C-alpha cells in the first residue's frame, strides 16, 4: 500500500476494483490542512482517463507488475518502441506516457522501466534525472537578480520547464523527471 503522496507517474494502482496508470501527480499543501494530491489516471484495460483528488495520507493499493529495464528505440506514430537486453521490442502508446514523452529523445542513453499488465506494455518509468540540451531560452535579464530568478526554457524533445537565469541556449542541464524541475547545469 502506498499513500497518495508517494505515487509517481508510471505507478499502477487498483481503484474501485480496476487497474489505473498514474500519468500525472500534483500536490498542493496548505498551512492548516493536509496535503491534497490530484492524480491524472488512465484505465489500463479501457480507453478512458480521469482526474481524481485524494488526501495525501489516503492509502492506495499499488499493483505489483512485471517491469523490465529497456532502452528507447524509435517512435512509430502513435507508439513508442522500447527494446530490452535480449532485443525484444515493446510498444507503448504515446498517451500512456503522459509528461514522460517530453524526455524521450532519439539516442537517449538512460534506461527506462517498461511496466506490463497481463503481458501488455502499459507504461514507462523514466530515471529520476535526465540530461537534456536547452534548445531555446531567453537571454539573461540584467539587474533583476534578487532571489532565485527563473525563466522558461525548451529542451530537446519539446518539453518546457523553468531554469535558472544563467542557463543559455545550447547548455546541457540535469532535470528531475518526477517534478519537471531544473536541478543543475552539466
From Swiss-Prot:
Keywords: Cytoplasm, Elongation factor, Protein biosynthesis
Stated role: Involved in peptide bond synthesis. Stimulates efficient translation and peptide-bond synthesis on native or reconstituted 70S ribosomes in vitro. Probably functions indirectly by altering the affinity of the ribosome for aminoacyl-tRNA, thus increasing their reactivity as acceptors for peptidyl transferase.
CDD domains: S1_EF-P_repeat_1, S1_EF-P_repeat_2
InterPro entries: Elong-fact-P_C, NA-bd_OB-fold, Rib_uL2_dom2, Transl_elong_fac_P/YeiP, Transl_elong_KOW-like, Transl_elong_P/YeiP_cen, Transl_elongation_fac_P, Translation_prot_SH3-like_sf
Highest taxon listed in the record's lineage: Bacteria
Any GO molecular function: translation elongation factor activity
Disulfide bonds: none
Protein location: Cytoplasm
Protein name: Elongation factor P
Biochemical pathway: Protein biosynthesis; polypeptide chain elongation
Any one of the GO CC terms: cytoplasm
SUPFAM superfamilies membership: Nucleic acid-binding proteins, Translation proteins SH3-like domain
Organism of provenance: Shewanella pealeana (strain ATCC 700345 / ANG-SQ1)
Protein family according to the UniProt entry: Belongs to the elongation factor P family.
Biological process terms in GO annotation: peptide biosynthetic process
HAMAP family: EF_P
Amino acid at each position: 500500500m502506498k499513500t497518495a503522496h508517494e505515487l509517481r507517474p508510471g505507478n499502477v494502482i487498483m481503484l474501485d476494483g480496476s487497474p489505473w496508470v498514474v500519468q500525472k501527480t500534483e500536490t498542493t499543501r496548505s498551512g492548516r490542512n493536509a496535503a491534497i494530491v490530484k492524480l491524472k489516471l488512465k484505465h489500463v484495460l479501457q480507453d478512458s482517463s480521469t482526474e481524481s483528488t485524494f488526501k495525501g495520507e489516503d492509502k492506495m493499493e499499488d499493483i505489483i507488475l512485471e517491469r523490465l529495464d529497456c532502452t528507447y528505440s524509435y517512435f512509430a506514430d502513435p507508439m513508442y518502441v522500447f527494446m530490452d537486453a535480449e532485443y525484444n521490442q515493446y510498444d507503448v502508446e504515446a498517451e500512456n506516457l503522459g509528461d514522460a514523452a517530453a524526455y524521450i529523445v532519439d539516442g537517449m542513453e538512460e534506461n527506462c522501466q517498461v511496466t506490463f499488465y497481463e503481458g501488455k506494455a502499459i507504461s514507462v518509468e523514466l530515471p529520476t534525472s535526465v540530461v537534456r540540451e536547452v534548445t531555446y531560452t531567453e537571454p539573461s535579464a540584467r539587474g533583476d537578480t534578487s532571489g532565485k530568478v527563473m525563466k522558461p526554457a525548451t529542451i530537446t524533445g519539446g518539453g518546457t520547464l523553468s531554469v535558472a537565469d544563467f542557463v543559455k541556449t545550447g547548455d546541457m542541464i540535469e532535470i528531475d523527471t518526477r517534478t519537471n524541475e531544473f536541478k543543475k547545469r552539466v
